[in-house]
């Protein structure tokens, strides 16, 4: 493969990956809510502490993505969300969230209201890291492509 062709391929991949990355930002947030699956897909009576910690994190940093859960965002991942359980999650975790009615009104979900669904008590996040390194799919694809191009280019 000629160097010019490699460059064109790399630029095309970068454009595609930037589009995918923009579309999947909430998908990554939904995936991070995996500890809550047993609560929002089944009728488990209490969510785990890990679920509550993750919910508090999402509310703090990506609350707009919570609307996607209520709007069927879980179905794109093959998950059937029990909407009643999903709406009960903030109260069960004692996490204040913006009202669910804001999801359909078009207003910003990030602006907090006095009338949240849950309590004002938010669980503290653990300060210790689990030691894992998390890469996004676009970054992995770019690294893979760059290494492949380097390997091909080195042969010529």
UniProtKB/Swiss-Prot annotation:
Residues 99-130 are annotated as: Disordered. Residues 1-22 form the signal peptide. InterPro entries: Bifun_inhib/LTP/seed_sf, Bifunc_inhib/LTP/seed_store, LTSS, Plant_nsLTP. Glycans are attached at residues 43, 82, 117. It is a lipid-anchor; GPI-anchor. CDD domains: AAI_LTSS. The keyword Transferase does not apply. It comes from the Eukaryota. Confined to the anthers of the inflorescence. Residues 112-128 have a biased composition (Basic and acidic residues). The keyword Disulfide bond applies. A lipid is attached at residue 128 (GPI-anchor amidated serine). One of its GO terms (molecular function) is lipid binding. GO terms for biological process: lipid transport; proteolysis. Keywords: Cell membrane, Disulfide bond, Glycoprotein, GPI-anchor, Hydrolase, Lipoprotein, Membrane, Protease, Signal. Disulfide bonds join 26-67, 36-51, 52-93, 65-103. Residues 129-156 form a propeptide. One of its GO terms (cellular component) is side of membrane. It is found in: Cell membrane. Its main location: membrane. Belongs to the plant LTP family. PANTHER family: BIFUNCTIONAL INHIBITOR/LIPID-TRANSFER PROTEIN/SEED STORAGE 2S ALBUMIN SUPERFAMILY PROTEIN-RELATED. Probable lipid transfer protein. This is Non-specific lipid transfer protein GPI-anchored 26. The gene is LTPG26.
């Amino acid at each position: 493969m000629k160097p010019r062709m490699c460059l064109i391929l790399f630029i095309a991949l970068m454009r595609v990956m930037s589009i995918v990355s923009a579309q999947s930002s909430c998908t990554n947030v939904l995936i991070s809510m995996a500890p809550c699956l047993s609560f929002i897909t089944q009728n488990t009576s209490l969510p785990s502490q890990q679920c509550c910690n993750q919910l508090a994190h999402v509310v703090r940093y990506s609350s707009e993505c919570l609307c996607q859960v209520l709007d069927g965002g879980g179905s794109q991942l093959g998950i059937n969300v029990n909407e009643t359980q999903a709406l009960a999650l903030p109260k069960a975790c004692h996490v204040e969230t913006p009202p669910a009615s804001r999801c359909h009104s078009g207003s910003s979900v990030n602006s907090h209201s006095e009338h949240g669904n849950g309590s004002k008590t938010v669980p503290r996040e653990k300060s210790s890291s689990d030691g894992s390194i998390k890469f996004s799919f676009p970054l992995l694809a770019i690294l893979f492509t760059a290494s492949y191009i380097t390997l091909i280019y080195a042969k010529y």
